[in-house]
């Protein structure tokens, strides 16, 4: 009999993590989902679906705000959650490469600090799972290990910087709290269905190709030699559910990254061939592409964030051997990009005109 508390609902990873947990774990008594008041109405239909699929579990939509003391929960919810929670998943964050620093700092850093202070009050806590990102490495290059965190390199954007600062806060509590830190790579849709809620991350390539589909020749963007570390959502949630209950994962920081990543150039070529049935021709110098994307009209037309191009020249590589040592026991493996590209393109094709799927480009 266990209770699980989640921040970050109704975000994509959180939704899929709840579903995976209930599909694989017995005796889940209570699921507590912290939501901002403005997001409660959109969360209710999702909860109804959960209730139909998993009638033996009680679901609680709890209004709150991670940036406030006690997560801004009312006293009644606070008491119930404290009594019934054994596992906490902190996923709430600003996932936006173009976010302003003040906003990212408030949610990613202050929010994480408030979650940590609140978690210390839980008397029945068995594990805190904190979702960081592999890209807390910032502009570090070379092999990046799971045991490494502190560095003096700068960052490509405020998202990376504030997630780095937040992870430092969590890492400092490892001796006091039962913590596992998850560092995902770039998350994409389900490997078997292609399903995703937002066309961000690797889908920006498809946005770019869709906008230029009428051109007889479409070039590469720069040399594209950087590593493209993309992982499907099903690998992320299966791994996380297993690691939650693994004693070997307690106190660890783990890269949920692709152990066999491909280059950006190769990924771009694969997606173009599957999406447009043509191969790239030539190359546009990356500085020229960045200059073009300084124009808001160009960014909105292409549906591409300018900050995404910073990853085209980054020379880092993620070592995920510690995660693999633990996950190998459960035979949980990351599918290759080549094996999942067909479903990714198929799903994008079916939903490319759905504006709710596209992220806001300013």
Task: Give residue ranges: language-model regions.
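N-terminal Rossmann NAD(P)H-binding glycine-rich loop of SDR-like oxidoreductase domains
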Residues: 2-27
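Amphipathic terminal alpha-helices
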Residues: 12, 28, 319-362
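NAD(P)H-binding glycine-rich loop region in Rossmannoid oxidoreductase-like domains
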Residues: 59-110, 120
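Conserved Rossmann-fold NAD(P)-dependent oxidoreductase catalytic core, especially the SDR/UDP-sugar
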Residues: 90, 98, 102-103, 110-158, ...
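Active-site Tyr-X1-5-Lys
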Residues: 154-185
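Glycine/proline-rich active-site loop of Rossmann-fold NAD(P)-dependent oxidoreductases
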Residues: 190-203, 243-254
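A conserved pocket-lining segment of Rossmann-fold NAD(P)-dependent short-chain dehydrogenase/reductase
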Residues: 193, 204-235, 239-243
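Mid/C-terminal beta-alpha module of Rossmann-like enzyme folds, strongest
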Residues: 242-305, 325, 348, 352, ...
